[in-house]
A protein has these predicted regions:
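Sec-dependent signal peptide recognition
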Residues: 1-6
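Extracytoplasmic copper-binding redox domains, predominantly the cupredoxin/blue-copper superfamily
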Residues: 8-11, 15-106
Length: 106
């Protein structure tokens, strides 16, 4: 599953123009102990990637705006590229009581 996501991201990155004006940035979000995301709100630019890393002892998930639910085991990560400006909400569907946040893409 992670390989497929990575392959899709790499394929999409290769489909654009060969000219690049700025490098793509990656922002990391920790799935910290106490069932929370750190930071909860992220501001990025279109084309940037967010990587969620599970630093907790429990399995968590990342679901952005009701799309595919990505299972993230202890010590693993999942990365999602955000190409379209807007506000996106993400949640751990296993522990949604306080494990939610926002990605703002400018």
């Amino acid at each position: 599953m992670r390989f497929l996501l990575l392959a899709l991201i790499l394929f999409a990155a290769g489909c654009g123009s060969s000219e690049s004006t700025e490098p793509v940035a990656t922002t990391e979000v920790q799935m910290a102990k106490s069932y929370r995301f750190d930071p909860k709100t992220i501001e990025i630019e279109a084309g940037d990637t967010v990587t969620w890393t599970n630093a907790d002892n429990f399995t968590h998930t990342v679901q952005v705006d009701g799309q595919e639910d990505h299972k993230v085991e202890r010590g693993e990560s999942v990365s999602i590229a955000f190409d379209t400006p807007g506000t996106y909400h993400y949640v751990c569907t296993l522990h949604s009581h306080d494990m939610h946040g926002t990605v703002i893409v400018g």
